[in-house]
Structure formats: structure tokens, C-alpha cells
Amino acid sequence: MSQQNQLEPTGFTTRTIHAVHDARYDASVPPVYLASTFGTAGEDTTYMYQRGANPTRDNLQATLAALEGAEHAYAYPSGMAATAAALGVLEAGDTLLLGMPTYGGTYRFATTELTKRAVKTRFISDFTTLSDEDFTPDVKVVFLETPTNPTLQVTNIAAVAELAHRHGALLIVDNTFMTPYLQRPLELGADITVQSATKFLAGHADLLAGVAATNDPDLAVLLHRGQLVSGALLPPIDSYRLLQDVKTLALRLERQQQNTREIIEFLSERPEVEKIFYAGSSSAEQAEVQSRQARGIGSVFSLLLKDGGDAQAFARALPIFVNAVSLGGIESLVSLPAHTTHGAYAQEHRDEFGVDDRLVRLAIGIEDVQDLIAALEIGLKAAFAG
């Protein structure tokens, strides 16, 4: 491609498709390099061994960095591998401020693996009350999801970043529910953003991957070390597949969000439903924050059945929806957080953060919305049939 024909794309989907280019052969789709080792006789030793670097993974990482608005992005074999790499900044004697509720895997990592490393964890249930007094000298990292899983509470990323940085602490944001299409935490002050690429980025429930991104060169070294030293890196074939999948992210999410809005409207009129949790639903303040820092509500939400409702009967009877954990795929899913993703929670934390047995999480796909609504009617009737 000649220099005069080059244009820096500004649109999100344009970047997903054209962020990387096969300069050698001008192929419309960059090739996949499966080699485990590369010749080193020449001057260029960028690629020596697949664990250190791989052209296909580099193409993916360059694309992910462009989408995140980041200088550096790194691909891992799972979202938890990305989270573990980011939390590798913590050392013995440090304290982590962990936003709650949070994904069960993150909770388990903090309460087991970090504890073994002599890292303390303090749980934060309401970031609006976070103050200077919370930042003792040992606090090095704040880790949060916004919106949270599974009750979709929203946190003001910019406000927490400003407070954390004032005390020399880092802010890590799990952006799985929003993706960089809807929300870009690094632009709001976060130091690292992580997400399970298994979910929306891949979008077809057939690939496991994670990503961490940063603008800080020192943190980039840490994140790359998380790949290199532990071997937690995404293989070339999975990198290639994710590179292809992410090209349709915006199209999928727009359809998923539209379905979600219509389903929430339907459920809000149902007498069987006590409460619906979606990003910004808890208060006018949270709605304002969500509208300011994100471009929508995403396609994951939870509902609380009224007393007497049987969530397990609801999930079992629900047609079309797959009764399974995960989210972000083209197919709609139903799960019961208390028994699945958040089963690792101590009972006191389940009670405190609203992970109730009657809580049902729905991840909406791209099916025709009238079919999803018809399926939900069947599930609601089954939940109260006893």
C-alpha cells in the first residue's frame, strides 16, 4: 500500500478490520503463523520462539490495543490469566482494594492465591464512600468491575482513578461486560484494563482468551512477563480466530443491546419479577455515570424473582436460552449466580452483596427478540407453578 493511500481509521469497526495489514503480500486476511521456532541467522531476531513472540498474536495484540486506545495490549489463554498477570504487580505486604460483588474467579484468586503471597484484600461494596482514609500506605491496587457481576452496579471510573492516583495506587478495571466498544477505562484514568475475551470479543462461545491493556511502559513489561514467565499466552490459531471474531463485535453488540432493552421493558411489567438489575438501574446517580462513561447498558442483566419464585425451575423450563455460565455470545444464556459463577462466595458475602437464590442472570444474544420474550413467559410461569 503506497503512503498516499494510507488513512488512519477513526471508526471502531474500521479499526477492528484494518488495524493490522499484511505488508508482505497485501493479503486481505493476515496469515496464521503456527511455527514454534523461527530462524535467527538474520539481523531481525524479533521472532525466535513462539512463547516469546508470534506474528499472529502480535497482530491480534495490535488490534486490541487500537480498540482499547492503548499503547500496549497482551493476549492470554483466559480472562483469569489476564487478571492474574495484572495483579502480579502486588507484592508481599501490599493490600488490594477489591470492588464487590465481583466475578467469582477474581474473588477466589484474591482470597486464596493472593493470601498465599501475603497480600491482603479489603472488600469495597460502595465506591461512592471511598475516601482518603481508605488508602493506607500498604494499598497498592484498586480492582473493580463496572458494571459489577451479577448485580450491575456502576462505579465512576474517573473519580476512583483520581483518588487512587493521589495515594500512589493503581486502578485496574475489568471491562468484560462493556468491552472497548461501549467503554474505554484507560481514557477515564485506569492504569490497566482487563477482560475475558472469551465473552463478547470472541462472541461465539467456542474460544477461551483474555486481554490486558495499558499505556504505562513499566506496566507493559509486567503484563508481558505474565505471558513469558508463566507461559500464559494465547496460541497462534486462537489468536487468529479472535482476530477474525472481533471484526463483528460492534454489529453483534448493537443487536444484543437492542434485544436487551426490549426484554427489560417486557420484564418490567411482569408481576413475577421483583427487581431488574442493569447498568444504571440502581439510582439516578448511577444512570448518569453510566451514560457519561459508556455508550450503552450492554446485554447482561439480572432479575430477582418475587418471593415464592423458583429460580431453578425458571432456568430449567426456559426454551432457547442455554442454561450455562458465561456471556457475550450470539446465543442467549441463563444462569443462577448463587450456584455457579459466585458459588465460591462465603455465605456472608452472598447475603451482603445480593447474590440471592432467587437471582437470575441473563446474557442476551442475537436471536429474534419475540422468540426470547416468548421463552421468558414460559420460564416465569414455571417459576411459580409449584
Feature roles, as predicted:
Residues 230-231, 318-328, 379-386:
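A common structural junction motif
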Residues 2-32:
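Short conserved active-site loop signatures built around small residues
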Residues 2, 10, 111, 121, ...:
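PLP-dependent enzyme catalytic core of the Aspartate aminotransferase-like
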Residues 32-33, 37-84, 88-89, 105-112:
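Conserved N-terminal alpha-helix of the aminotransferase class I/II PLP-enzyme fold
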Residues 275-360, 364:
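Conserved C-terminal alpha-helix-loop-beta "cap" of PLP-dependent enzymes
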Residues 21, 37-38, 214-219, 246, ...:
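Short loop segments at secondary-structure junctions
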Residues 2-8, 72-269, 277, 288:
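Conserved PLP-enzyme active-site core in the AAT-like
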Residues 67, 267-271, 318:
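Acidic-histidine catalytic/liganding microenvironments
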